[in-house]
Amino acid sequence: MASLKKNGSSSRLQDRKPPNLSITIPPVEGERDPKLMQPLTKPVFQKSVSLQEPRGHVAEGGTADVRPGFKRQTSLSQSIKRGTAQWFGVSNDWEGKRQQWQRKSLHHCSLRYGKLKPQYQRDIELPSQETPSFQATESPATHRLPKIVDPLARGRPFRHPDEVDRPRTPHVGLPPQTPGMLSLASFTSVRSGYSRFPRRKRESVAHMSFRAAAALIKGRPILDTPHSRKAGQKRSFIYPSFMDEDTVDAAETLDSSFFSKVDMHDETFSMPDDVFDSPPMSASYFRAPLPIPELMPGAAIEAAKEPVKSVQVYTPDHRRGKRIASQVKHFAFDRKKRLYGLGVVGSWLNRTYRRSISSTVQSQLEHFNSHRPYFAYWITFVHILITILAIATYGIAPIGFAQHTTSELVLRNKGVYESVKYIQQENFWIGPSSIALIHLGAKFSPCIRYDEQIKNLIEKQHGLERESGCCIQNDKSGCVQTHRKDCSETLATFIKWPEHDAPVLDEVTGMKRTSGAVCHQDPRTCEEPASIQPHVWADDITKWPICTYQAMNNHTGIRHMDCEIKGRPCCIGTKGSCEITTREYCTFMHGYFHEEATLCSQVHCLDEVCGLLPFLNPEYPDQFYRLWLSLFLHAGVIHCCVSVVFQMTVLRDLEKLAGWLRISIIYILSGITGNLASALFLPYRAEVGPAGSQFGLLACLFVELFQSWQILAKPWKAFLKLLGIVLFLFLFGLLPWIDNIAHIFGFLSGLLLSFSFLPYITFGTADKFRKRAMIIISLLVFVGLFASLVIWLYVYPINWAWIEYLTCLPFTNKFCEKYDIDQVLH
């Protein structure tokens, strides 16, 4: 009978129990399973009794204290394989991570690509599950009935439903509702404090001694007065010592709830299912007394109906002080989620989700958090810093779209002043000149690989230098290395071997030298390096080394050695051209003057123009690191501002979705691929900036749109809007100083990399295999594209003149000046 009675009452309680409520009652001490009372065979492996065991963790067999068996440690190859599969999102145990990716995807889509379908939109509006809450165990909410707050919960760590996605700021004091109802949790809850302030723990002797010593050193009284405590700095959160565990008597709780008056209108909406929704404990300490209409006189009632401008609630000294401003807390704790497919651009384009979306996709959005945009902030800081340093070091070039010409009277080789012109390309970005940008690390093909055209130009200059000689002025004003046609037959004497006192090349045969002479350099007088066997200087002045030490200076008896030299090599321009001229002319032309050399063949002008690290072989440029170094440079202030705006909107938004590692890989590889293509098709144009990287990020938006196609309400409208933005940017790239080639190939590489690295929502089990195939195909195509560009750049260079029209349209004759090899442009 007792068992039947017990079973009957249990069934009645089971019928009244809410469907989602689970209550675990521990067994009575005397009714434990005898199997659990038996000692273990290996007491060494018993768990400590001082640790609190979590509920629901006991195995079915009743062996709660038995540890699981030992497992073999996974090998390094298996760990790498599993980690790689998880990173690409194709592992077998990736279900939880996939749900997080898909929740974040919907958040991003709702902000970037427009309105979603209604079922996806409802899933986004569900409360977040980031923090522990009992909302998942509540019964379904009834319509047109407000939630009832239990006044007897007394500070349990529950939160309001509308608080879950907001910062954890203290609540405004709410009056207790349903004062006559007493819940079971009210008698057993700890960490209480609903009706009174929790007591403070005593300070330790060490803490009080340290505080007294600090007070004596600072000259303050040891015992604080109430006034000094009041003047101290307040805190918005109480110390942990205030939150000691103490059980409050139920009668005291009933008293506090009984004297809390509420309106009877709220009493009629009491529901047992919502009794667990209680305000946070901080709300109970600052409740302002509410006016009771039946106890107030008529004048007071009229005054109470007027709007209250400001209410100041007095709080005692022992309670917490001033709170942090709500604006500061919202700024500090605000972590807005990014909906997949609805990011910043989606909010600009007014995208939404569609209505018909399966519940499987909705369930994937519940644990989807946004990443911190560390890479966006870092790259923006680096861009701003480098731009400031570049402008401070090299200054600002003439502003405009055409060429800038400067004229000035400059002392030339013949000792007379001549009017010379200096032509340079204008920069409308408000920044350094192209020479300065090349020196800083701009993308410039002659500095990256061996260029056949530049090599032919240098060989042509060396051929002319072999026929040169020393032109000595008859008035003994000086001498200069030049050609016969540039030396006056009346006012000067042209010294050329073997016509004028040529030295002997071979002592055995008596053959004399035919290449020379060279002003201020002769094999007979140079001692370092000396022209002796077996290191005799060749009969070709273009192969002579620089003489670092002369035995006799001005009294050798050799005419081209005793004269005063007027010109030395000067590297001018960006193509490695060299002239023997004066220092004044070299400075005016923004060249590099070599005081130690006497011939242009003794200097390597291309190494001087490129700067940075010297070439391993001066004849073969090898600065391939310019392909990614130029991503951190900008052509000017406006260029940098455009990049900052793009990175603070699009880049930061995408990084919140995919994380810094995936976005940084796409950013860097897209930029390198774009610069590689630009170096191939536009070899003689100095380009800087992350143009390819930015268009690679725009390709990420397209991939995200394609993967969110099934959940968007109007996907074609979002696609056309995004396509219009990209086409406008491509048309804008037809202006000079904007690299459209880097835009195109950066977009293609970003498209391929996004299919491999970006997460996206899956619609069924077949999507897993589809994603694996997509990753493999995308990576293979990207590797093939990158390898083809490298081979074309270093092995089989391509020179297509028509491709320049893709990056600049010549609206005028000088709007897009060609950077061919024959022009001396800067």
UniProtKB/Swiss-Prot annotation:
Q: Where are the transmembrane segments?
A: 381-401, 627-647, 663-683, 686-706, 718-738, 744-764, 775-795
List the GO terms this entry assigns under cellular component, sorted alphabetically.
endoplasmic reticulum membrane; plasma membrane
Q: Which UniProt keywords apply?
A: Cell membrane, Endoplasmic reticulum, Growth factor binding, Membrane, Protein transport, Transmembrane, Transmembrane helix, Transport
Q: Which molecular function GO terms apply here? A: growth factor binding; serine-type endopeptidase activity
Provide one Gene Ontology biological process annotation. Answer: protein transport
User: Which stretches are Lumenal in the membrane topology?
Assistant: 402-626, 684-685, 739-743, 796-826
Which segments does the topology annotation call Cytoplasmic?
Answer: 1-380, 648-662, 707-717, 765-774
- Where does this protein reside within or beyond the cell? Endoplasmic reticulum membrane; Cell membrane
**Does Transmembrane helix count among this protein's keywords?**
yes
Composition bias (Basic and acidic residues) maps to 159-168
- Spans of biased composition, class Polar residues? 1-12
Query: What InterPro entries would the database entry show?
Result: Inactive_Rhomboid, iRhom1_2_N, Peptidase_S54_rhomboid_dom, Rhomboid-like_sf
Family matches, as Pfam families: iRhom1-2_N, Rhomboid
Which PANTHER family does the UniProt entry name for this protein? INACTIVE RHOMBOID PROTEIN (PTHR45965), INACTIVE RHOMBOID PROTEIN 2 (PTHR45965:SF2)
Q: What does this protein do?
A: Regulates ADAM17 protease, a sheddase of the epidermal growth factor (EGF) receptor ligands and TNF, thereby plays a role in sleep, cell survival, proliferation, migration and inflammation. Does not exhibit any protease activity on its own.
Q: This chain belongs to which protein, by name?
A: Inactive rhomboid protein 2
| Annotated organism of origin | Xenopus tropicalis (Western clawed frog)
